[in-house]
Amino acid sequence: MKKFKILLSLVMLIGLILAGCGKEESATSADGKTTIDFAIHVANPKEQEPAFYKVIEKFQEENPDIKVNLIGKEQQEHVKGIKMQSQSDKLPDVFWMLPASAAELEKAGMLMDLTGFLDDNPDIKSALKPNMINSFNKDGRQYGLPYQPLITGLFYNKALFDKYGVKIPETFEDLAEAAKVFEKNGITTISKGAKDDYSVWAFLTMLSRYGYFDKIDNILAGKESYNNADFVNYYKKIDELRKVGAFPKNVTTQTYFQAVEQFLAGKAAMLDSGMWDVQKIEQSPIGKDVGFWWGPTFTDGVGDQKVSSVVSSAPLLVSKKAGEDKAKKEAILKLLKFYYGEKGTQIMVDNQVAPMTNATVNVDEAAHPLFKKLVDQVQLKGWNSQQNQPDLVVPEAIGSAMYDSIYGVINGTYTPVQAAKIVDEKISAIK
């Protein structure tokens, strides 16, 4: 019995020592460094997210007392892992997460409130675009901050517009007239691929010009119908473009990636895409001739027509546990200040990621002419971004129905009324 008590005492002592060591390692290690475990949604951050990686690299260089331990996994594995870790309350200190899952973690009380960080850094708070902040704020609690901007719109080949004497459009009427000219000359106006039904970015922004964000909350609550006059008018405009031959004749069988190649080959005047294709376009034979446009305004639209699309694709989150560790919290706040400050922003820009803030940045126009044009559009006076992408604020099934409705009209499968009805029925089905 005596031996058992001694053994039990030794086990408890070892346990206390190990617990103490673990606690010390979680904050400041023996070498005086504080470690931040940062989980990211790619397996190789250095290669797959070079802009992000270089910000972290520079931060560590300027803060030798802080080590950022990057934990990289491909997105699906990363998201699954975060969900599993949340069940045992072992979340990483800082991590990337999908918006819907981030909201669930906030609801479960597992995230640090970042409101104080913004209040203590008014320069960053005022520089960040409002929709970047508001997307991850619930009842006054700032539970996340944007990882990087998601910028979408229409790339256009100015050489084709010049060749056929067509001006760069501003209004829907301009776009429809341009489509007629291009159709006569065997040129596709807007290259698209219905096989990848999510590839409707610019058309989702157009939907925002018909009052989408004024209506969607009431629509989801059952107080209004998606099948309303304004949204039907929106689909009518897509149908008009179809009738004047604006889309590829093989749009139903073409993929998004084939649509990109069609544009790069000079066979289409425009491409519905986003910032991720800038480098590929710049390196192509048409690169020097390409510009970027937010899409047309509509005379029958609802509300502000100068709507751009600079939104946050996903947030960075800080675990509540990390916020309760004084050393970690201090290190994390330093990292966030660097990431969203002028230095971090410029490093992002140097690596072809457009700014999330209104900070003045320097772009090497000679090396990256299209990226410079995109940044100019992001910072264009008088244009304000939609709150988010319309498909990102509804359940996935409804988002998919929206894709189907848009391509259904482009393909000639649905009438405008049928398109609106398809989405409305999906909303009713999942209530």
Predicted regions and their residues:
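Conserved N-terminal structural module of periplasmic/extracytoplasmic solute-binding proteins
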Residues: 21-108, 119-122, 168, 302-304, ...
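Glycine-centered hinge/linker elements that transmit conformational signals in sensory
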Residues: 181-182, 221-251
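Hinge/lid segment of periplasmic solute-binding proteins
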Residues: 74, 99-152, 176, 182, ...
